[in-house]
Structures are given as structure tokens and as C-alpha cells.
Amino acid sequence: RQRFGVPIERYHDKRRAEQLRGLIRPFILRRLKTDPNVVADLPAKVESREFTHLTGEQASLYESCVRRMLTQVDEAEGMQRRGLVLAALVKLKQICNHPALALKEGPVAMGGGPIDPSRSGKTIRLLEMLEEVLAEGDQALIFTQFREMGAMLAPMLAHHLGKQVLFLHGGTTQAQRQQMIDTFQRAEGTYPILLLSLKAGGVGLNLTAATHVFHFDRWWNPAVENQATDRAYRIGQTRTVQVHKYVCRGTLEERIDQMIESKTELASNIIGAGEAWLTELDTRQLRDILTLRNDAVEDEA
């Protein structure tokens, strides 16, 4: 790690990256879907970012969390500091998803019904896009790294879209898992939406009935995200796959999205991407990443 990891990840040392590439080249054979010799008839994959705004409630929660976190980080060192950084990043991502997730309100709101989509810019946009997907008779996968978020989204989507929504997560039994997959793959239109927790549904599934993949929140490691997308974009897929990655403007999500793209470019050269780089940021860098920008909340005027 000291010889290659730190120089490459932190300082973007091209010479060390070239040395590492030379060392591992004899031991790694990469076979990419973009190589026509590997898969000649795989259709196109179109990736896009869906930029959303925070609601006023989200912005207030976000700024409060940032102030508290920066104060704590200034007083901590070593492993304690790293833990505080990661915990704060998770909390801020939860706020970006929906206030109910960050406030631990549970899947059913106080009124007895599903969560209110108008409290989050992401859920507002997700409903709009899914209405278009369903109008075309298409099917969709929705990935989230938070099981609790999936539990909130499922009843909300079913209520507003009038369709049954399947939810596959770590607590799903093997029998239930296979039944969900079979139901979704039959493509009869009754169950056109499959929600998946990223770790439980990100690998080992064939879900080619889907032509839209939504990443409701982003993972630190792009390879994990790509594996999830490949549940739909794989051998057996006959139509173009649209991949939608949600990013909240003016928040840490937008800055981390830019950093992820940098990591992806680096990973394509040295085959690998880690997560430790997030905890290595100094307080000045953290403040720059976390501070809410002026464009985070949409100007109602």
C-alpha cells in the first residue's frame, strides 16, 4: 500500500501506476463486454446522471449534520476520526435520499401511509421517470445501498404508480428470491419494478427483463455499481439498457461523483479501486466536499 496505493490514490502518481500495471499485466486477463470478440450481439448501454435538488427540509438537515460533524472531526484523531468521517458521509447520503431515512421514521409515515415523496428531490424525480418507463411498457431495477430506503420506497412507489413492487434484500429467503426473479422475468407487466439492496442483489442475478437501471444512491466503489448494472446488461439482453445515476446537486454527492469518475479512470489503468481514500481527506478537503452549495436547493422564484 505504501509503495503503490498511497502514491497512486492520493497523489495520482502516473509513474507508480505504470509500474503497477507492468507488474500485474502477466497475471490478469481482462475480458470486457465492449470487446466484440467477447460478446458480438450485446446491445448498447446508455449511462446518464440525473441531477436533483434538495428540498428545504433536506437542506436544513444537511447543514446541521455538516456543522456537527466538522466540530467532532476537529477534536478527533486516527481511527476515531476515520470512523466519524465515514459515519457522517453515510448520514449525509441518507439525508440526500429522503429525510425519513435519516430521521429513522420507518417505512410507514406517521399518518399510516407511505412516505411523502415531496420531501425529497430524488423521490420526486424517481416517480416522474418511472411513470415514463411504465408508459412505454418497460421494466426497471432500482438499487439502493440502504435496506431501510428500499423498505420505504416499495410502498411509496406501489401507492403512487398503482403497480406491485418487488423488494429483494438480505433478509429475502432463497425460495422468495427465486420466486421474485421468476415473477419479474416473466415480463407480464404486473410486477414491472424490482427494488434491490445493493449488496443482496448486486451479483449473481439474471434480470434481463429490465431495460432501465436506477442507482438511487451511489456506492464508494464503482466496480460494485457496475456489477449491479450488469444484472440487466448481460448476455441474453436484446434491448438497449438505460442506466440512471441519481446525484443531488450542490452536495457531497456531486463532489464524490466527480471523485468516483477520477477513481474509475484510474481503475481502468491499474485494475482496482479502494474506499480508504475517503478517510484520508484532511479537514479542509472535507469542508470543501461537505459544504452545501448555493445550487443545492432549487430557486422557487
Task: Give each language-model segment a name.
Residues Q19, L23, F27, L61, ...:
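Generic recognition of well-ordered alpha-helical segments
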Residues A17-E18, H244, E261, E265, ...:
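A general structural signal for short secondary-structure boundary/capping elements
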Residues P36-E63, A76-L205, A276, D282-A301:
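Conserved Helicase C-terminal RecA-like lobe
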Residues V6-H12, T71-M79, W277-L278:
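Short, polar/flexible loop-turn hinges at active-site or ligand-entry regions and domain interfaces
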Residues G5-E9, R67, T71, R186, ...:
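Residue-level marker of structural boundaries
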Residues R1-V38, Q237:
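Conserved P-loop NTPase motor "coupling/switch" region that bridges the ATPase
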Residues L29, V39-V66, T173-Q176, M180, ...:
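SF2 helicase/translocase ATPase core recognition
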